[in-house]
Amino acid sequence: MVRIGIVDTGIQNPNHPAIVGKIVAGRNFSLDRRKKDDISSTTYHGMAVASVITSINPNVELVIAKVLNYWGEGTPNTTADGIIYCVNQGCKIINCSVAGPPSKKLEEAIRYANDKEVIVVAASGNDGKTTKYYPACYPDVVTVGAADNEGNRADFSTHNECVDTLALGVDIEVAFRDGTINDTGTSFSAPIITGKISLLIENLSK
């Protein structure tokens, strides 16, 4: 069973059918941290990302690193803390549907993951420009942009030399509260690639 780290907002509903029983560890690194083991969230983003992964490969274990608060606020250093935590929890892949400025600590966290042979997948961003966001633009990160329903780059998808591949990013069904909604963004393109990589790892280990 492949273990996957999700560096994001935490989990809105741990009993949602898409993820129930799959979370094996979690830590709160966000700016609004109250308790270090509190990975709960009133926003759905992290759970939505997790549900995209499990829709592709249900046979996974999830490690949750909460690095963003309700408003989506975080720092490169909280993201770095989340990545390091997921590596140390034995994850083979880490999904980062977060984007922000660079920092030395974040760069070192990516290098640490690479040294431990952990694959980091990151969303390119949603500004439709050539802006460089991080961790997406660090070397050896699998950077994912969004494609539309025709397979072309979606207008909102950040595009630059950092982008390695595209995945569908329009009208993706994701977990929300007790049910689902359809949402759009590179945040949901990245976990499609994460899920597919997990299938490859699973098949290679047989």
What role is predicted for each listed range?
Residues 1-61, 81, 88-89:
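Active-site core segment of subtilase-fold serine proteases
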Residues 12-13, 29-30, 55, 59, ...:
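Active-site/binding-pocket entry motifs
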Residues 18, 140-143:
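Glycine-centered tight turns that cap/initiate beta-strands
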Residues 48, 65-140, 148-153, 159, ...:
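Substrate-binding/access-modulating region of protease and related hydrolase catalytic domains
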Residues 53, 65-68, 169-206:
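Hydrolase catalytic cores
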Residues 63, 119-122, 142-143, 166, ...:
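Structural detector of well-ordered beta-strand residues that form the stable sheet scaffold
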